[in-house]
Amino acid sequence: MAAKPKTPPPVDSLTRAQAKIEHKRLALEIETHNERYYQKDAPTVSDAAYDALRQRLEAIEARFPDLITANSPTQTVGAAPARGFAKVQHAVPMLSLGNAFSDEEVAEFVERIQRFLKLGPDDIPAIVAEPKIDGLSLSLRYENGELVRAATRGDGFTGEDVTANVRTIKDVPHNLRGRNIPTACELRGEVYMLKTDFLALNKKQEDAGDTVFANPRNSAAGSLRQKDVAITASRPLKFFAYAWGEMTDRPADTQHDMLEWLKDVGFKVNPLIELCNSVEKVLKFYRKIGEQRASLGYDIDGVVYKVDRLDWQERLGFVSRSPRWAIAHKFAAEQATTILKGIDIQVGRTGAMTPVARLEPVTIGGVVVQNATLHNEDYIKGIGNDGQPIRDGVDLRVGDTVVVQRAGDVIPQVVSVVIDKRPNSAQPYAFPHTCPICGSHAVREEGEAVRRCTGALICPAQAVERLKHFVSRLAFDIDGLGEKQIQEFHERGWIKEPADIFTLRERNPKIKLEELEGFGEVSVRNLFAAIDARRTIELNRLIFALGIRHVGEGNAKLLARHYGGIDAFRAAMSEAAAAQTDDGNASEAYADLNNISGIGDIVADAVVEFFAETRNVKALNDLLEEIEVLPVAQARNDSAVAGKTVVFTGSLEKFTRDEAKASAERMGAKVSGSVSKKTDLVVAGPGAGSKLKDAEKHGVQVISEDEWLKLIEG
């Protein structure tokens, strides 16, 4: 049983030697948390726990100033930029804010400003109060009104160049509009994600078996820092502008007027911002925003106060890592203690098995919480995605008294265990190795946190997604049987597995499809004709249609070419699966599969796991009773294009794009989607665009569609 963390002694009671040891430990721990938060977008402690560590470190340094070093977390901002992005030097540092955790500390902040500016006790400086968006800080550089660079905060002095990704965010204007546009300026704000968009993204990630995000801040940061711009573009990121760095000609003299200017030039500015002229009004704003917090569409973790007059901001300047003229008034974490009554397993559309905590109902922030996400089996054991301990390494057991927090106001999370209240009867949780929905065995691939059901073709939880894949364009491509029809036919029990598609006609006298809304006799005849047209299919398309994990269009072709026909493929996979099931030793069939160029361990294991599930094999056998599978002709190695890399561009008149690709592959060529110096041939039709220019740039031969036909027919 894990020991309960000890309460540290008061800082006032520490000797210098004790303080030095604790200072070193705290600094290292905070630096580790900074790296996880700023670089990996995967924090393992709550904001409240992190703030407590910083407060402890600051208290030690206040009592023992000689322990302060240039590298202390109290003297630095964020974390160094991660590898993989170009570094950007900020013209004006992007520093973080000091924190206030009570009304008294806010009043002290205003008093410090008054003393520094030598103002009278009744001369209260105007304060701009704004919600503190919980997202990722971003700096945008504009030159002559045009966006030229975007960078993350990084360590405050050097950030990451994310320009290409930021151009996909609709809230970020590519060109500033209106008048008073400085020759050069750095405009700053926060990238964030709406709560509803975050929940939808996590559902998508969960269904795909990918890592889910802990909160909207992590999802926004992770989405912005993608190497693939297309992924960022697919994520619904938002942006609020609220600050600036370098600026050649400042268009206003107050913070409030600068925010109005930011709106004028095309940015979104938080509409809840208020100008306050007393401490009482500042605190009233804080309480009002706190009451609205749960109903806002986005996450906030406090309120920021800034001196309104910019000349006063300049006079006040900075201290260490933060400005004197601004402070963040943080919200207390919304937590409650309850009992973990059970752990339920949900199965996603792709077989990912996700544990969910069933809790004794408890109210947190005005919301009744009965369930909390547990992410995966490692999370239950007290291990984070990066392999590091979470919750002090304490595992979760049914019957535990747990502390639950509404992470980012959205998804409740179990943040700690009250270990002293653990029942003697509580046992370590055993994550199931079979699917609770269909009973198929569940596997966890090496290097992954997710365990998956292998009953791809027969698991009801996966059925709709698998059937949609089965009839997709690169698989059986059945016209008239789309997502809507698959969903409805499955809900009515008409199609449960692939073979059912091909028995619809004979079952129709009982089903009466023509009586279904949106269908008529003509529609039904057309659907049956489209199904019958797909009773003959190439082996590679069938393999792809099975929806085996890691087996995409390319790998399906590699497998089909290697085995040639369905009988040889089935026999080899059955032998490989049987050997794995019997004694765990690899068979000759597995070795042969694994040695196929381009396949490898991960794909080979996924294929064998599919065939090791007997109900998948039965579903495939039932399907083969209804269809004919054509053997795959071996690619030629003696054609004029064998071994060459070919790119098709523009409109093709004699081929569809898929037919052109297939013709090239039959001739032994490799088809690519982009032109590079490694490309041998570009086949260009009418309307060829950038790929034609790329071919000219790299000196690649360009031919017409007719010339291509002569080449492959000769």
UniProtKB/Swiss-Prot annotation:
What is the organism field in this record?
Answer: Nitrobacter hamburgensis (strain DSM 10229 / NCIMB 13809 / X14)
Q: Where is the BRCT domain?
A: 636-714
Function text: DNA ligase that catalyzes the formation of phosphodiester linkages between 5'-phosphoryl and 3'-hydroxyl groups in double-stranded DNA using NAD as a coenzyme and as the energy source for the reaction. It is essential for DNA replication and repair of damaged DNA.
Sorted alphabetically, which keywords does the UniProt record give?
DNA damage, DNA repair, DNA replication, Ligase, Magnesium, Manganese, Metal-binding, NAD, Zinc
Cofactor annotation: Mg(2+); Mn(2+)
Biological processes per GO annotation: DNA repair; DNA replication
Would the keyword Kinase be found if you checked this record's keyword annotation?
no
InterPro entries listed in its UniProt record: BRCT_dom, BRCT_dom_sf, DisA/LigA_HHH, DNA_ligase, DNA_ligase_AS, DNA_ligase_CS, DNAligase_adenylation, DNAligase_N
Sites binding NAD(+) sit at 47-51, 96-97, 130, 153, 190, 306, 330
> What is the protein named?
DNA ligase
Q: Is Magnesium among this UniProt entry's keywords?
A: yes
Note one Pfam family from the annotation: BRCT
Question: GO: which molecular function terms?
Answer: DNA binding; DNA ligase (NAD+) activity; metal ion binding
How is this protein annotated for GO cellular component? cytosol
EC number, as in UniProt? 6.5.1.2
